[in-house]
């Protein structure tokens, strides 16, 4: 049995669930101590012209919004589940976001890596994604 089977037979018993906008309005926006939000399972499938020309930008995003007290809240969305262009296959080619918390206490280096591609000499050259939306530094106030 899978979780999906259980929900089909037992129903989804959680009431008053919150969708992303409600999470922002009820939790993140009024909070005095949330500085960063990480999320996934959203966005679009990467655009694939061919195996050597893949645009992963639709499956990730980054933005900074203001909380109720005017401070910045960093938000990063990364949907690795669709990294191979669909919902099945390699489960997104095992893409991970590696966050490196820097000694200054404010900077976080972000890199995108696939251990699946790193395993094979044939695909090692594709193990690190280096576009500006896959490799960047976040500054937390």
Descriptions of predicted regions:
Residues 45-141:
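Binuclear metal-dependent phosphoesterase catalytic core
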Residues 35-36, 74:
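Proline-centered loop/turn at the N-terminus of a beta-strand
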Residues 1-35, 46-59:
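Active-site-proximal segments of metal-dependent phosphoesterases and phosphodiesterases across multiple
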Residues 26, 36-39, 87-88, 101:
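Compositionally biased, low-complexity repeat tracts
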Residues 1-2, 40-42, 79-81:
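Active-site metal-binding loops of divalent metal-dependent hydrolases
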């Amino acid at each position: 049995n899978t979780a999906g089977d259980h929900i089909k037979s037992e129903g989804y018993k959680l009431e008053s669930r919150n969708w992303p906008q409600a999470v922002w309005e009820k939790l993140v926006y009024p909070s005095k101590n949330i500085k960063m939000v990480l999320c996934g399972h959203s966005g679009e499938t990467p655009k694939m012209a061919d195996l050597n020309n893949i645009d992963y930008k639709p499956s990730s995003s980054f933005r900074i919004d203001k909380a109720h007290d005017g401070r910045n809240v960093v938000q990063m969305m990364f949907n690795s589940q669709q990294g191979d262009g669909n919902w099945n296959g390699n489960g997104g080619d095992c893409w991970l976001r590696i966050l490196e918390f820097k000694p200054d206490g404010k900077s976080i280096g972000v890199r995108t890596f696939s251990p699946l591609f790193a395993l094979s000499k044939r695909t090692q050259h594709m193990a690190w994604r280096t576009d500006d939306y896959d490799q960047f530094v976040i500054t937390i106030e």
